[in-house]
């Protein structure tokens, strides 16, 4: 079938089961082919092909609300809602988003990117439906990994208490990104093998009612003994105890089983949970046989061999450099413990986990718990290393402030994917952490210019005993600079001059250092001499150097691959104002006050005006404005 001809999901409503199976095969071939060129979340989407088709067959989108948790498994939904022709642009600049996008389609009723939000959103939609007196079905689809998130469990508790009408689809593939962990995962494992509880209960009730004279009384007695029956038939009965009608387990690749259970769910009053078992990566053997999460989300790959297309050469990956440096130090410091919220592969912690299995904790999608777990460890003299993406640290803000920084505990936050991340777009750009961290008392915040300085910062962080410390670092590979064999501490709060100059000053750090140096080279050819400072400590700043620079009366330009509001440039302005440099010329470049969508990092930087050429032009505009201090 030519999938680009699909304009509306109603097309699946008239298909026979054999036709639906053929459509599934066509979609899998399409995804494998398209994603081999663009990259994307291949594993999750290959696993939900039949489930997505069945949902669109039984429900009437967009009237009925299909809400995709996390959203990376929405590609099949996009195909069935008329967007197959755009898949060549998937996750590309100005192209199709890799997540549900309300501006893209009326069928995308909720935008996601972070996990565990679907149930709360669904409940809000269901309450609005009931208050307005409409009759649409509300259907959140949540994975077993996302169900480990505290927000999802909070919503389950509230939905069950309110007896809200909705149909929750639990897509259980035994993995989130990496293999799942935790007691809830073990409960689901028992449910997978327990048989269809709801069907057995209903059949028993019908059988008892057929017994002459006493059947009705026996059925009533059985209903009163429902709890005993549940515990006999199903190990755990977790969802029934929360107030849900539990259906399953259902074969997520069998249309008859799926459609039968979805039809039954539509008849049930109150919240229903349909437990669907799927195989992540189904239909493409490299993804289907993946046990660690390599094929969860990928770059381009070769279909025939299942090998990834190599990107341009560079240094070691930043995640790998940080984790391996921690591992190296941990060999001589038994206090070091690693923690990750469900990202052991992305954070390159496999080696640490293999060498120190009793000192490595993957807590699942539980950023708040991960942070306070680290705080608890620190109270007992341990040195917790929390590997967490910038975008996910947002979810643990109160714990950072209240549990770690307020108590001045020695926690090392390794903030991965800081800055623009590219193809994952606005839900994953790591551009807010400076603004939400720099004002928190007791916290040290730093970012290295290259991987050699990065390894020394890791060492500095793990040697630091005066409170919490955080190191930001970008996605991808380093610059390929030589690495010192011996690790050394960097004095806290010190900057360094990378290039001297007499006409203007650039203050920057991290990934924008190379941009500043390139701009300085361009300006030198025009006779403009620019000093470039590596402002590697964002907090505390190098106040002695900052005084010296302000006393020089040179115009200052700050550059950051982060939001301007409340960022590093703002801290420099505040310092100048607070210390009486009221005539200082200070301008800022960074991320504007809007969410940055998907595209390559270079394309996004060009769009927002953050390149070496833009920096050189900006320096030229502030040169005539040099003024003396008041």
UniProtKB/Swiss-Prot annotation:
Family: Belongs to the transketolase family. DXPS subfamily.
Pathway per the UniProt entry: Metabolic intermediate biosynthesis; 1-deoxy-D-xylulose 5-phosphate biosynthesis; 1-deoxy-D-xylulose 5-phosphate from D-glyceraldehyde 3-phosphate and pyruvate: step 1/1
Assembly description: Homodimer.
Catalytic activity of the protein: D-glyceraldehyde 3-phosphate + pyruvate + H(+) = 1-deoxy-D-xylulose 5-phosphate + CO2
Enzyme Commission number(s): 2.2.1.7
MF GO annotations: 1-deoxy-D-xylulose-5-phosphate synthase activity; magnesium ion binding; thiamine pyrophosphate binding
Keyword terms of this UniProt record: Isoprene biosynthesis, Magnesium, Metal-binding, Thiamine biosynthesis, Thiamine pyrophosphate, Transferase
Residues that bind thiamine diphosphate: 72, 113-115, 145-146, 173, 284, 367
Keyword Transferase: yes
NCBIfam families, A to Z: dxs, PRK05444.2-2
Protein name (record): 1-deoxy-D-xylulose-5-phosphate synthase
Cofactor annotation comment: Binds 1 Mg(2+) ion per subunit.
The protein's role, per its UniProt record: Catalyzes the acyloin condensation reaction between C atoms 2 and 3 of pyruvate and glyceraldehyde 3-phosphate to yield 1-deoxy-D-xylulose-5-phosphate (DXP).
Pfam families: DXP_synthase_N, Transket_pyr, Transketolase_C
Listed cofactors: Mg(2+); thiamine diphosphate
One annotated Gene Ontology cellular component of this protein: cytosol
PROSITE patterns assigned: TRANSKETOLASE_1 (PS00801), TRANSKETOLASE_2 (PS00802)
